[in-house]
Amino acid sequence: AYLIAVTDRITHLSKGDLGHSAISGTPVLDELVQHMPPTLTLLACGAGLALAVGLPLGLLFAFGAIRRIAAPFMQIATATPLFCAGLAFAYGAVQLLHWPVSVNMRVGLAVPPDQALRLAALPIATVGLAGAAAVQLALRRAAARSSGEAFRTGLKRLGLSGMEIEFLYVMPQIIAGLLASAGEIALALVSAAVVAEWVFNRQGAADLFVQSVALADWNMTAVILFAFACLTIVTGFFGRIAGYLLAREEMA
């Protein structure tokens, strides 16, 4: 009976039948296509905020004594549970700004532009700040690796100042290290999106993933997990290629 069930399942998979969602009863691929655009939009906006915040912080804390002073504080900040940060954002928005953060944003629901902006601001901030922590960590890690490079001594003997060495030779290596960490940053953004969509009741693919796990809907869970894994792997792959090409061009 087990072999028959496995054979039957493989036959359905070969035909593109991945099962049906336990939540809506629709095919899992249709459910994924319906819920993925809001999550991709959240990830894109969060990535933009992560770069806008993480790049200046990472570069500020990447050089000299500032890196050593800021290291323990940044470790504490990055270790803060994202769930707690999301709840803090929600509490501040309700108590201080009087924003409606608990409205259930259903797919296809039309809302006024100002309300849509308020509903989107907190999830984007949650995802963006989580991504910013990953960005600045990648920059500081790349700066720490480049701080012991042997070419610094040779360049100083050629008459270059420390500032020229940092910006002309070290900075490209740091940016290359950031690009090489694109997969880790994407993983941080996806993880933050799961928390943000669940805390702020946004019905995207990340929230659907949480619901599917709770209902033991493993067909839906596997498809969403595969989509997120592909997104992270592809981002990391192209990021590593870009980082390698940038570092190679600089060394040439």
Language-model segments: which ranges?
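Generic hydrophobic transmembrane alpha-helix motif, especially the helices
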Residues: 74-130
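A short secondary-structure junction motif
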Residues: 13-17, 96-100, 146, 189
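An internal, D/E-rich "acidic patch" concept
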Residues: 1-51
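Alpha-helical transmembrane segments of integral membrane proteins
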Residues: 32-68, 82, 111-252
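Short linear capping/connector segments at secondary-structure termini
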Residues: 22-28, 105-108, 226
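Flexible, active-site-adjacent loop/turn segments at secondary-structure boundaries
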Residues: 20, 97, 197-198
